[in-house]
Design a protein with these regions (language model features):
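N-terminal export/targeting and maturation segments
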Residues: 16-81
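Phenylalanine-focused residue identity feature
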Residues: 8, 19, 34, 48, ...
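Extracytosolic and intramembrane catalytic regions of membrane-associated proteins
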Residues: 52-138
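N-terminal Sec-pathway targeting helices
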Residues: 1-15
Length: 138
């Protein structure tokens, strides 16, 4: 019985590893979504900068404009538990914390990390000029 349980657990771990590699995880899916819609997103941001109105992406994800020293337009793509994933447009091409929260950013492995009150924290890195990936946990 123990041997069958061990084989089952090992098999499930292999299946999980294969699906993780093939699917690439949440981060890769968010980046692929950005890349797939990059031209459309660029058009939306050009229109937003001209009119001040967000149009288009609301049908397929949560889009919010956050004012601040450096404005941002945040596209929240998905969430898992208390962690949110997405990307944002920074007209000034500067990295920002989730929801444009005024907290300091510190350099991290390939981007910047931030920490706010309690266990609120996140991570961001640049995808291309004016565009950044983010993860935020609350």
């Amino acid at each position: 019985m123990r041997n069958k349980t061990w084989v089952f657990v090992a098999g499930m771990m292999v299946i999980y590893a294969v699906f993780s590699l093939l699917g690439g995880g949440v981060e890769l899916r968010v980046v692929r979504l950005f890349e797939k819609h990059e031209a459309e997103l660029a058009e939306q941001m050009a229109a937003f900068e001209e009119t001040g109105e967000l149009m288009g992406a609301e049908n397929w994800m949560d889009v919010t404009h956050w004012d601040g020293e450096h404005d941002m337009v945040e596209y929240t793509v998905t969430a898992a538990g208390d962690t949110y994933y997405g990307f944002y447009y920074s007209p000034d091409d500067v990295p920002l914390a989730c929801q444009n929260t005024e907290v300091p950013l510190t350099e991290a492995e390939k981007g910047w990390a931030w920490r706010a009150e309690g266990d609120n924290h996140g991570y961001t890195y640049q995808l291309k000029e004016n565009w950044f990936y983010f993860e935020a946990s609350f």
